[in-house]
């Protein structure tokens, strides 16, 4: 009989562990992909229009729009909608971009750059076309210049592109926090 109770305890322990796992997942807002949209914890729909680039730096609008859309998709507060039927729409414009040397070596060669952007966002209520939020968000990133003598140009371009991606992600994180404060 002790053998039977031992198996029963193991089964109860496994069931209890499974219940705690499911409870903790539900408690932190986890939902199944196929869950209906009217489930508790409904996320707010948000349409993000492609950003415009008012600077001479190419491709910033694509990087910024993609980073923000990815952050929205990953967030637990919002859901990205691609259609014009969304309740709120977000427009953005990259207004300023600057890149300047931050550090020099003993021979006055640049070893580190800093890049800065100022991105203007405007959140609009779709039904009334009334702005809910207008804000300029500043972001910056730093990158090191390669000391290599063979692939210096390629490494510098890769470092700059990585810094631009970090810059776009930093903007997306700041923007997401601002949207959460505004809409929730």
Model-based region annotation:
Residues 2-16:
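Bacterial N-terminal signal peptides that target proteins for export
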Residues 15-27:
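Bacterial N-terminal signal peptides
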Residues 26-69, 75-77, 168, 173, ...:
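A structural "domain/chain start" motif
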Residues 39-41, 85, 108-116, 170:
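Short coil/turn motifs at beta-sheet boundaries
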Residues 47-51, 77-93:
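Short beta-strand->alpha-helix linker/helix-N-cap micro-motif
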Residues 75, 89-136, 140-159:
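Surface-exposed short loop/turn segments
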Residues 156-170:
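Individual transmembrane alpha-helices with interfacial aromatic-anchor signatures
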């Amino acid at each position: 009989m002790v053998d039977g109770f031992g198996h029963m305890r193991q089964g109860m322990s496994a069931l209890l562990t499974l219940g705690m796992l499911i409870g903790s997942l539900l408690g932190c807002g986890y939902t199944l992909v196929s869950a209906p949209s009217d489930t508790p914890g409904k996320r707010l729909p948000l349409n993000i229009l492609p950003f415009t680039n008012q600077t001479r730096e190419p491709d910033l609008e694509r990087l910024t729009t993609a980073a923000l859309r990815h952050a929205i998709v990953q967030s637990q507060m919002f859901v990205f909608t691609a259609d014009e039927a969304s309740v709120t729409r977000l427009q953005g414009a990259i207004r300023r971009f600057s890149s300047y040397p931050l550090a020099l070596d003993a021979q006055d060669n640049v070893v580190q750059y800093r890049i800065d952007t100022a991105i203007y966002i405007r959140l609009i209520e779709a039904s009334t076309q009334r702005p809910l939020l207008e804000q300029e968000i500043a972001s910056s990133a730093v990158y090191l210049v390669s000391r290599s003598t063979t692939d210096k140009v390629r490494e510098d371009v890769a470092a700059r592109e990585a810094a631009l991606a970090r810059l776009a992600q930093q903007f997306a994180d700041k923007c997401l926090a601002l949207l959460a404060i505004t809409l929730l």
